[in-house]
Structure formats: C-alpha cells, structure tokens
C-alpha cells in the first residue's frame, strides 16, 4: 500500500510539527534538512501520527520485519520501568532505611534551619570578625602618623645605621650575582630564625617585621633610609595588635615611597626571576590611596610619534591601566587631526580585568600618522567625561595625555569645558627623547590641577604612571579624619602565599607642616592594610547543617562574590583581583538579577525561586526550587546571602545519651563505632568517611584509607564531649555508621546481587558516611568520599525518582575497559523521611549495575520475548513481524540516554565501550533530531575561572614590560640612537655592576616560564537537559533517500530517555554534531563590546574625596633636561653595544629617584 504524500505543515493530533513527504514519494517543498542545528525554524523532522506507522512501513532489506508500532515501544518502556523499580525496591532499601531511622528515633533530634535568623547571625559574626581588624588598623594608622610626625629627617643617614630584616636578603645571598653580593652589602641586615605557622602557610618570626623594597628602587637612597628609620617603630604596634587579637594575619604598611613593612617577618616569596612586586601597584593600596576615578587616556599618534616613542607610549598606557581597579571607569583614545577610541568601547567602561585586556590589545594596534591636534584629543576626552547617560564612578575626573610634545596649549578648550571650577584634572606625559619645548605640557597640567611627567625611556614608565595617585590623594589628606574610612577590597591572591584574601585598608597621612607657616602637608604617607583569609570567613558559616545543596554566599558593591561555593579560581594572578560576578557564579536569570540588585543596595530580602543549577561535575542541569535570604553586613560594603532547598529546612542532630557522655570513655568505646573499623568491612561493607574537620588534631589526608586510620587512632584518645572536636560532626558520623550498618543487616546481606547483575549497593548520608557493599566493590568505587561533593548525591536530593549516572568518558580518552566486570552504572535515589510534619532527606541509596549484563537484559526487555528464558520469536518470509531490540539489532538501534544526553545502555555491542559519552559523539544524526524535537534543550554559560594549556610561544620573556627590540629602521634612525644612548649611559653607569644578572637574557617572565605553566582563561560550557516533551513521540529524520524512523519516550520515575531508531543506511544523514565538551573562548567569553552596552548593576564606594578648597596645586611637575653631546653619546653607545654578549635583548629595569617627603 502506498503511503500518501504529505506536504509541509501537515499536522496530526498533538503538538504541531513541520513535516515533509515520505522520501521519494511526491513533491519536496521543504527547506534543506542539513541546515543549521539551531534557529527560528526546525524543518529537519517529519513527525507522524501513530496510525501512519503501520506494519507496511518496512525497513529496506528486511521485508519480513517492520518498524515497531508505538504501543509496542510503550510496552517495552513499561517493562524497563518495572524492572528498574523492582530492583531498587529490593536492593535500594529506601523503605527499610526509613523504618530504621524511625526505629532509632531516640538517637537524634530534628533541628530547623531558620533562614532569617541564620543569615543575620552569620552576618553579625562576620561583622565582629572584621571589626576587630578595623580596630587594629586604626591603631596602626594613628601610630604611623605620630611616628612620622615625630621623626627628624636625616640628610646624612647611611645604610649601616639602619637595622632591619630585608625579606629578600636570603634569596639574594643564595644568588652570587645578586645586588648585595655584587656591590658588597653595607646594610646591617638581620638574620632571623623562623617557625612553621599553618595559619600563615609559611615560616614566620613573631618578634620582627620584614621589609620588602622593589627591585628598581635603590635601597641606600636617603629617602628610603629615612623611611626605614621611622617605620621601625611600627614593629611594637604590630606585636601589640597580635597580642590583643591572636587571629590577625598579615599586617602591612605600604609606603608611598615603595617600601613595604609587614608583620610577622617571613622571607619574601620572590620567584627565581626578577621580582616585579611594588606595593603601590597592588589593588588594596590603590583602593586605599585614592577615591574612585573616571579616566580618559588620550594618546598622540601623529607622524612625529614613531619608533621607540610610540612603543614607549603603548607600554605606558598599559601600565597606566594597571593602576585602575573595578571601582574605576576608563576609556582610551588616540588622536592626530581627529580623535577616535582605540577599541570598540565608545564610552567610559568599568576598569575590570576583561575590559582592560581589550584596551591593552587595542593599544598595540595604534599607528602614527598625520599631524598633532591637541584640540581634537581634549574635546573628545571632555565629551566622554560629561556623558551622564552611562554608568561611571562619579568621583575623580581626569585626562591623561601622552605625547612627544607640541606648541598648542588649547586654552580655549579648557575655558569651555573645565574653567573656572577645574573639576577635571589634566595629567600630561612627555614621552621619548626629544628637544621639543615642554612648557605647553607643563602649563596644561598646572592650570588644571594635574601634574606633568616625563618618560624619556623605558625605565621611567612604572614610577611615572603611578605617581598621579599622590595628586589624587591630596583632597583625602586635607579632609583629615573625615577621610579615615576603612575600605574592604575585592578578593585577590595574597603575594605571600596565604591564598585568597580580602584586605581592610586605611590611608596614612603626613601630619607634618609643609614649609613656613601653618601650611598643611598634602602628601599621603601610604596605606595600612590587614589581611583576612577567606577560609577564616568561611569558618563562620554553617557548613553541614544546610545540607549538600544549601550554602552561604556574599557579594560586594560590584556584584562580585566574596564567598560562594563556585568561587574556585584554578589560576590566580596576584597582580589582579579575583572578580567573579554572582551571575557568573550561578546560572543567570531574572530572579537572580533582582536578588543581586537588592543585595548591592544594602536591602534585606527573601525570595523563593525556580531556577536552573549546574551539577557538581558540570555535565548536567537540574531545574530546582531554592529559597534565597539576604542581609547587609554592617560597617562593610558586603552583603550576605543564604540559599536553601525546601528539603533542607530541617536536619538531623545526633543525640547520644547522657549516660554514655557521662562515662567519659573514648569515642572508640561508643556503640556503633566498631562498624567504622576495617575489621568489620568484610561482613558489613566498606565504609568511606567524609574528610571533614572533626577534631583540631586530626591529620588530613587525600587517601581515605589513611584518613580513616588517623581518625580511628585519634578516637582512641578523645571523649565524646571533647572541646577539641566538633561534636555535631562527630556524633552524626557515629549515628550514621550505625544506621547504615542496620541497612546491611536488614536488607543487603541476605540478597544475592549476582541474580540481578549488580556490582554493588551503597548508601551515603548527610553525616558523612558512604557504605559500599560488598567490601570488594570498594576497590572500584570512584565517587567522592565526601557526599556533599559527590555529584550523584547532590543530584539525587534535587530530583525525585531514580537517577542514572554512567561512568564519565571524555571523547579524547580511550573507550571503557569491560574486562573483569568492573564497569558499572550508578542508580541512586534520595531517602525522604517524614517525622510528624517535618520532611527531610538525610540519605541517598543506590545500586551499581553491571554494564555488560544489563545491556543484555536491556535487549530482552525491549524485545518480543515475555521473559529471558523464552526462545526468540522467528519470523518467516510468509509472516509479518515487528522488529525488536534483540533480534534485529543489526537494523534497529535501541538506547537509553540520560537527561544530560549521555549514553547509558545500548543494544549495540560495539557501543558498550562508549557508555558515558555524549550521545552526539555516538550518533550525531539522532541526537540532533532529539534536540530539534524538544526532547532536549540546552544551556550555554561561561567558566571564567578555567585554566588553559600554555599558548604557542610568541613574544615571550620579561620584555613585555619594557624591553624594546630595535628594527633595522630604528638603527638608521638618529632619534633612536640618541634615546638608546642616553638610556644606556644612565643605566650602565648606575646599574651595570649592581644588576649584572639582568643583562643575561632569560626567555621567561617574572613568575616562571609561560611555556610550562597553565594560564587563566574562559571556557564555554554547554549542558543539555530534558525539554518540554513528556509524551511518547514517533518521528522521521528526513535526509533524502536515507530517512530514519525513530521513537522516543521518557521512562517514568527516572532521568532516562528510551529511544528506538532505524540504523542509518548511508552517509547522507550525516550532519554537524552538537557539542557538549567545554571549549576555549579566545575572546574571553561573550563579546565584551556587546556586554558593555548592557552593564550589570553596581554601585561604587559611598565616599568620595575629589575636591578640597585648600588644595595647593602649585606642585604640578617641572621638566628638566640636559643638552646631550651627540658625539659622546654615539661613541658610548657603540662601545656598549659592542661590549654586550651576542644574546637576546636584556631585561632592563630602572632606577627610580624618589622624592623627599
């Protein structure tokens, strides 16, 4: 019988689908099915009503068999559902475990998590912790100002007059080519003994402070020696602070001269290469030294700016960008006759890490041409700063102009935009070696409350691109006590190895009189800082009473997370803060945007939302219900949130009887403790215990067997009410040990696992116990021993029914090894316990299926046999039969796919070793059909904390921060020779002996060779999850003469999709694969140019000091130059070039003449 042709748009009862005529029968008006996988239309499939899938539609080459009818496949699905449910009822022991809990009701209490009370208590505890650090900060800042005020400046001070511990001395003394070894150290350097201190993750000495001085600052200068002299008195204040608060970590004074004095003393963690650390460029120092900034950088790219000068400008702009933090806003433009932005950003944008990277890359593309037009550059900059339609800092406003010089003062522009109020500061930078008159540049800066700087060579860049902060600090200093505001930073990596920290900062002012009369000094002395480790804040949050899927988080005014379980940067750069937005830490939706805004505004709130969450292994998406509760943390810029699933409203707390507690016996004598001993494993199953901090003296270990051994040894000495142990954790562990042992006794021990092809049965609990039976199955158990960190545990709690988890397979790895019957599929389900009106889920139970045996069972259940022992039905030429998954596995593909799109079971023997792979890697054509028919939907997100393999080497070495490799054109350029000669004279004469090692080429950065280390990057993630289709569907994959019929149906009470399809007969059905594997994003995630058009809500610090009527702007920079003798310089340059060894360009560092305070 011929099947009537159907035109596009034909429909049948149920969801309407775009259809095509049966292949080869009638017109083909539909679009090409091999088009894009996504888009507004999905014309790939023809869905047919069940009545049309008649036995007459036979598969080619199998005339006696037809594609199974829908009711047949639904029957197979029911058989699969019944088999799974039966095995789980017998072996899972859900009902029996409920009864065990109720039988032991006297051993535990049910406690309630009250979100509002919890979050307010934690916020109060964090506030108290930070307040203690604030008090210590204030004592330090006050003391520092008094010490400096009382200090008498010494012009004739010598190095040997100063005793201090040089934090880099030990490393330098080990290096025979170090600065001190080469010139002979004149300092009276202290040599200290150190003790290991776990709290600091370092060796420390509590009796002294340590001093770190940047490599490019001369230790013996008068300014530095005087700084060391007066700051020595801080040592006693540091020590007293620690006496009052033993929990204090690093206490640091960062001086405006570049000196860092910190307590307790510890050797500097200098890399083997050059140490580029300068406290003045650290995020916490910059935040404490000035108020937020709106900055426009304009760069002269006229024709006179070429060669070395243009390269100096590019490097200077990049260094300037590094002085900005997330509270600042910036744009960069180039100008000649006209001005234009260097990047895609057309207005001020937040100076976050990703935006600054866009600027830095764009700056490298600047080309010199045309004539200088200061007017165009300044008008563009003022227009940018006057744009009120965008988010910005709304505090300090400034223009930074880099040029090689010019005659125009553009007074008319300043009169129009900036005078008489002069709300915008203008900083001018004369770049390169030239003979231009710099008076106009000085005038621009001096008449607009700015400063004039000269950058004649590479060595002057770092110091001269950061000293503008001293000018911005003037209003803060003049404001006096009003400006004494403690600020808390973003999260960043501690330079001394403490890990992730936040720092409280307080500016330190110069209280001395400046000059004759009562003129007040305007200079900032530096910034005082105290670190707080994130781990110390985390300890104040409830960990295990919130359940596996409950957590506490905190954000700042930028929306960046301070605390969050997903804040786990794999690579950290100590120069930049760790900035993970709350909406990037979770899967973004409108509800979370509202929560984030409310928290930034400092409001309280509570909201229950339905949202998507990513599984711990980042392979699955679940739709869940979460309760969010949040409050501000007083006296800080942080806000605290609590997230609880409804089933975590209650939790169990073990209640060991008073009689046992009064005995004062070791815990090892308690009832049920014997079931933790390895001697019981053979009969009771293997026990894994979560590696939690049960007691202070418990030695941690990544090996669970070793950890269990350490735990048992300690329990031989500890009593149940010991003060050194966490009784909640300890008692719940003992309780769950006994509970799970009774499950073995009542259910598992009497069952024959082999009968049902099971490799193991298991139970995991909130108390931290994972019991696997039989004991031998533990050898192949690969799940995390901490249930709260096990994906199967967390997903089972969030989903009802049976959750299948196939073994994880990466497409790049070799297929599964099926030998020795050790490969299994986990099936787990949560145990829901109702006690009165209180419902909770304290445990998860499950089985581990033998993959190969269940693959055979799967074929039988999806066949025309009623049971396994029945012979296969034979279908002769004269009779008509439906195909099934057992007899016709050469023509019919039958698979079970989980809700993430991963293969669980197949009737194809050659696919057994592909179990656990994303199904698109197994059958791309069929997976695309399932996606296009809404059986699956997908969620794309970005991982901003990923680590990527090193990129192929390009321009490596320490050179990016300042080494210019001259071209042939530069050698022929007289200006380059003059510049290079002048710098070489300065560099060689002053530092040739001191820093000899710098002139030895080393193709590595200061932190180590980029060829051998991973770098931080952004990865795009795609997860698939079940779509809106719950019914049983039949469809056809239309691809010319090779169309395929398929049927798909969700299995009730599981996370499985049952799919039956014709096997593809030719390559015409080949289509592009859907990708699930994480992929690298070269552009650092979503297009930044588009994102800045939709900026996320934020607010800056609530304080701003950008103006003071008493500010003295007369100190605005004065240029100085000397007329070079060209003959002498060229001769000297030739001599120096000939004297250098034939090696790559040296790493050049600068001498920085410091100013007297």
Curated annotation (Swiss-Prot):
A divalent metal cation binds at residues 300, 302, 304. Keywords: Calcium, Calcium channel, Calcium transport, Disulfide bond, Glycoprotein, Ion channel, Ion transport, Membrane, Metal-binding, Signal, Transmembrane, Transmembrane helix, Transport, Voltage-gated channel. Glycans are attached at residues 205, 389, 421, 510, 543, 627, 864. Residues 488-577 form the Cache domain. Residues 1-37 are annotated as: Disordered. GO terms for biological process: calcium ion transport; muscle cell development; neuromuscular junction development; organ growth; positive regulation of organ growth; regulation of multicellular organism growth; regulation of neurotransmitter receptor localization to postsynaptic specialization membrane; rhythmic synaptic transmission. It is found in: Membrane. N-glycosylated. The chain crosses the membrane at residues 1120-1140. Residues 24-34 have a biased composition (Pro residues). Residues 1141-1157 are cytoplasmic. Residues 19-1119 are extracellular. Dimer formed of alpha-2-2 and delta-2 chains; disulfide-linked. Voltage-dependent calcium channels are multisubunit complexes, consisting of alpha-1 (CACNA1), alpha-2 (CACNA2D), beta (CACNB) and delta (CACNA2D) subunits in a 1:1:1:1 ratio. Belongs to the calcium channel subunit alpha-2/delta family. The alpha-2/delta subunit of voltage-dependent calcium channels regulates calcium current density and activation/inactivation kinetics of the calcium channel. Acts as a regulatory subunit for P/Q-type calcium channel (CACNA1A), N-type (CACNA1B), L-type (CACNA1C OR CACNA1D) and possibly T-type (CACNA1G). Overexpression induces apoptosis. PANTHER family: VOLTAGE-DEPENDENT CALCIUM CHANNEL SUBUNIT ALPHA-2/DELTA-RELATED, VOLTAGE-DEPENDENT CALCIUM CHANNEL SUBUNIT ALPHA-2_DELTA-2. This is Voltage-dependent calcium channel subunit alpha-2/delta-2. It comes from Rattus norvegicus (Rat). The lineage of its organism: Eukaryota, Metazoa, Chordata, Craniata, Vertebrata. The gene is Cacna2d2.
């Amino acid at each position: 019988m011929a099947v009537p042709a159907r035109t596009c748009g034909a429909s049948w009862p149920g969801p309407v689908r775009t259809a095509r005529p049966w292949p080869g029968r009638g017109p083909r008006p539909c679009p090409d099915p091999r088009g894009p996988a996504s888009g507004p239309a999905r014309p790939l499939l023809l869905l047919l009503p069940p009545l049309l899938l008649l036995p007459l539609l036979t598969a080619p080459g199998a005339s006696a068999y037809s594609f199974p009818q829908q009711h047949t496949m639904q029957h197979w699905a029911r058989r699969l559902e019944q088999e799974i449910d039966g095995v789980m009822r017998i072996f899972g022991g859900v009902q029996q475990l409920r009864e065990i809990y109720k039988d032991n009701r006297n051993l535990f209490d049910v406690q309630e998590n009250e979100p509002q009370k919890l979050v307010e208590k934690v916020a109060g505890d964090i506030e108290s912790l930070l307040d203690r650090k604030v008090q210590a900060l204030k004592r330090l800042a006050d003391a520092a100002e008094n010490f400096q005020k009382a200090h008498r400046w010494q012009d004739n001070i010598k190095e040997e007059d100063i005793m201090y511990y040089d934090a880099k001395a030990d490393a330098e003394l080990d290096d025979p080519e170090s600065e001190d070894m080469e010139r002979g150290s004149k300092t009276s350097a202290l040599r200290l003994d150190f003790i290991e201190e776990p709290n600091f993750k370092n060796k420390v000495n509590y009796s002294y402070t340590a001093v770190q001085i940047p490599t490019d600052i001369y230790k013996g200068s008068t300014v530095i020696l005087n700084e060391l002299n007066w700051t020595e008195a801080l040592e006693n204040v540091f020590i007293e602070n620690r006496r009052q608060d033993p929990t204090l970590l690093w206490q640091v004074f960062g001086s405006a001269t570049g000196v860092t004095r910190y307590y307790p003393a510890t050797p500097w963690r200098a890399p083997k290469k050059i140490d580029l650390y300068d406290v003045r460029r650290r995020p916490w120092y910059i935040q404490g030294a000035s108020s937020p900034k709106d900055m426009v950088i304009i760069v002269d790219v006229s024709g006179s700016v070429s060669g070395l000068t243009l390269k100096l400008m590019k490097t200077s702009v990049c260094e300037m960008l590094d002085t900005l933090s997330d509270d600042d806003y910036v744009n960069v433009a180039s100008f000649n006759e006209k001005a234009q932005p260097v990047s895609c950003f057309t207005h001020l944008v937040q100076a976050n890490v990703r935006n600054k990277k866009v600027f830095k890359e764009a700056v490298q593309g600047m080309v010199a041409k045309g004539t200088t037009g200061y007017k165009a550059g300044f008008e563009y900059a003022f227009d940018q700063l006057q744009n009120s339609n965008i988010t910005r800092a709304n505090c300090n406003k400034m223009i930074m102009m880099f040029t090689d010089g010019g005659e125009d003062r553009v007074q008319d522009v300043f009169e129009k935009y900036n005078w008489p109020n002069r709300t915008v500061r203008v900083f001018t930078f004369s770049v390169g070696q030239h003979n231009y008159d710099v008076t106009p540049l000085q005038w621009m800066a001096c008449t607009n409350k700015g400063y004039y700087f000269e950058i004649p060579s590479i060595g002057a860049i770092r110091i001269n691109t950061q000293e503008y902060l001293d000018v911005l600090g003037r209003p803060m200093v003049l404001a006096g006590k009003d400006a004494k505001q403690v600020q808390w930073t973003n999260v960043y990596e501690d330079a001394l190895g403490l890990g992730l920290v936040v720092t409280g900062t307080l500016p330190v002012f110069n209280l001395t009189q400046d000059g004759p009369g009562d003129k007040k000094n305007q200079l900032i002395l530096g910034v005082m800082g105290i670190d707080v480790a994130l781990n110390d804040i985390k300890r104040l949050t409830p960990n295990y009473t919130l359940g596996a899927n409950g957590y506490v988080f905190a954000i700042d005014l930028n929306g960046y997370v301070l605390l969050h379980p997903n804040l786990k940067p794999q690579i950290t750069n100590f120069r930049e803060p760790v900035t993970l937005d709350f909406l990037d830490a979770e899967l973004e939706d409108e509800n979370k945007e509202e929560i984030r805004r409310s928290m930034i505004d400092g409001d309280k709130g509570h909201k229950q939302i339905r949202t998507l969450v990513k599984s711990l292994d980042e392979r699955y998406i679940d739709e869940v219900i979460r309760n969010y509760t949040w409050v501000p943390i007083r006296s800080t810029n942080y806000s605290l949130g609590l997230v609880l699933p409804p089933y975590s409203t209650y939790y169990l707390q073990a209640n060991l009887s008073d009689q046992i507690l009064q005995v004062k016996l070791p815990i090892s004598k308690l009832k049920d403790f014997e079931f933790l001993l390895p001697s019981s494993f053979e009969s009771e199953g293997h026990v894994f215990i979560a590696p939690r901090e049960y007691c202070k003296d418990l030695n941690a270990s990544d090996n669970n067997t070793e950890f269990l051994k350490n735990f048992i040894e300690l329990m031989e000495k500890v009593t149940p009410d010991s003060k050194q142990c966490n009784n909640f954790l300890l008692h719940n562990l003992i309780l769950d040990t006994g509970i799970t042992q009774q499950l073995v006794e009542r259910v598992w021990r009497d069952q024959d696992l082999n009968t049902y092809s099971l490799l193991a049965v298991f139970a995991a609990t909130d108390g931290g116990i994972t019991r696997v039976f039989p004991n031998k199955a533990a050898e192949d158990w690969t799940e995390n021993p901490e249930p709260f960190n096990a994906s199967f545990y967390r997903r089972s709690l969030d989903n009802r029914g049976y959750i299948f988890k196939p073994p994880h397979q990466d497409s790049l790895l070799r297929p599964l090894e099926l030998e020795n019957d050790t490969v299994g599929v986990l099936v787990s389900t949560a145990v829901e316990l109702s006690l009165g009106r209180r419902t909770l889920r304290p445990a998860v139970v499950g089985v581990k299926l033998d993959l190969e045996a269940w693959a055979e069972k799967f074929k039988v259940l999806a066949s025309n046999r009623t049971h396994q022992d029945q012979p296969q039905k034979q279908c002769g030429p004269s009779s008509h039969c439906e195909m099934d998954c057992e007899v016709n596995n050469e023509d019919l593909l039958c698979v079970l796919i989980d809700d993430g799109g991963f293969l669980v079971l197949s009737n194809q023997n050659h696919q057994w070793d592909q179990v656990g792979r994303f199904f698109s890697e197994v059958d791309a054509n069929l997976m695309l059909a399932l996606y296009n028919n809404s059986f699956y939907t997908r969620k794309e997100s970005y991982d901003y904390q990923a680590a990527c393999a090193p990129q192929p080497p390009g321009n490596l070495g320490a050179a990016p921060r300042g080494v210019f490799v001259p071209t042939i054109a530069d050698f022929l350029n007289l200006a380059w020779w003059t510049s290079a000669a002048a710098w070489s004279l300065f560099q060689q004469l002053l530092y040739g002996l001191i820093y000899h090692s710098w002139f030895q080429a080393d193709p590595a950065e200061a932190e180590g060779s980029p060829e051998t280390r991973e770098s931080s990057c952004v990865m795009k993630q795609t997860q698939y999850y079940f779509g809106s289709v719950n019914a049983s569907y039949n469809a056809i994959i239309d691809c010319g003469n090779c169309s395929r019929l398929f049927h798909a149906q969700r299995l009730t009470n599981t996370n499985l999709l049952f799919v039956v399809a014709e096997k593809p007969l030719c390559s015409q059905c080949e289509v592009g694969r859907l990708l699930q594997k994480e992929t690298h994003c070269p552009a650092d995630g979503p297009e930044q140019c588009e994102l800045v058009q939709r900026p996320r809500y934020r607010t800056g610090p609530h304080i701003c000091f950008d103006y003071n009527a008493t500010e003295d702007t007369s100190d605005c920079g004065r240029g100085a130059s000397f007329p070079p003798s060209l003959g002498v310089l060229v001769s000297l340059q030739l001599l120096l070039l000939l004297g250098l060894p034939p090696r790559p360009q040296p790493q050049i560092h600068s001498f920085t003449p410091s100013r007297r305070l």
